[in-house]
A protein has these predicted regions:
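Short Fe-S-cluster ligation motifs
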Residues: 39-58
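Canonical Radical SAM [4Fe-4S] cluster-binding loop centered on the CxxxCxxC motif
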Residues: 3-35
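Conserved phosphate-donor/acceptor-positioning beta-strand/loop module used by diverse small-molecule
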Residues: 12, 111-113
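Canonical radical SAM enzyme core domain
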Residues: 25-38, 58-102, 113-117, 127-133, ...
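Conserved C-terminal portion of the radical SAM core fold
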Residues: 51, 107-108, 133-193
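A short acidic, helix-capping loop that chelates divalent metal ions and anchors anionic groups
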Residues: 27, 117-124, 187-192
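A structural signal for short coil/turn segments at secondary-structure junctions
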Residues: 44-48, 76, 103, 145, ...
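Conserved beta-strand positions
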Residues: 53-55, 85, 111, 181
């Protein structure tokens, strides 16, 4: 396949109301071992054009994920990578430093912002302080000159806030690679809400 995904874990430290994964998966889901992920990656041709790292929240498996990322960097020198994360873990300087040290050159980090305020963002993630952690993580990654895509999933809870989100990005997140506006997938929690 020209487009391959590594699903690291179903677990997530947010509980987004529109998440396509069921609540039980996010709370109790399993994770792939790093060794198994490396074994699978060995069977993908080195010239594959694109790889996505996703989850749940892939960084929920902890710092051992960096071993896998380094393996990918060494094997897939010309591959484009997309890392899908809620970005909260990058409020921690240690995670920013480790990612910077091992991330492949042709990488984009896709991070969702659900609102221009903590009230809206945290209301959608159902997680207190997720707004501040996400914004902090984005800004720290930008300071390291990493390529960031902001993802905005539109729902009735943030549709009226799109202009404010755009203003926030323009005013306080210079260096963003691009912004993607995404429709909700009507499965999992999104179907319920």
């Amino acid at each position: 396949s020209i487009d391959n995904y590594f699903f690291i874990t179903a677990k997530c430290n947010s509980n987004c109301i529109m998440c396509p994964s069921p609540d039980n998966s996010r709370k109790n889901g399993g994770s792939s071992s790093i060794e198994n992920l490396i074994e699978v990656a060995k069977h993908i041709p080195a010239d594959t054009p694109h790889l996505t790292i996703t989850g749940g929240e892939p960084f929920m498996v902890g710092e051992k994920l960096f071993k896998f990322i380094l393996f990918l960097k060494e094997k897939f020198e010309n591959t484009e990578f997309l890392f899908l994360t809620n970005g909260r873990i990058f409020a921690l300087d240690s995670y920013v430093k480790q990612l910077k040290a091992c991330i492949p050159e042709n990488s984009v980090i896709g991070i969702p912002i659900h609102g221009s305020t903590a009230e809206i963002h945290d209301g959608i993630t159902q997680t207190v302080n997720s707004f501040y952690q996400t914004i902090s993580g984005v800004k720290k990654l930008l300071r390291e000159n990493l390529k960031i895509e902001i993802r905005i999933v539109i729902s009735k809870l943030n549709a009226e806030d799109i202009g404010n989100i755009a203003k926030m990005i323009v005013e306080s997140m210079q260096g963003i690679s691009h912004v993607s506006i995404i429709a909700m997938e009507m499965t999992g929690s999104a179907y319920v809400h």
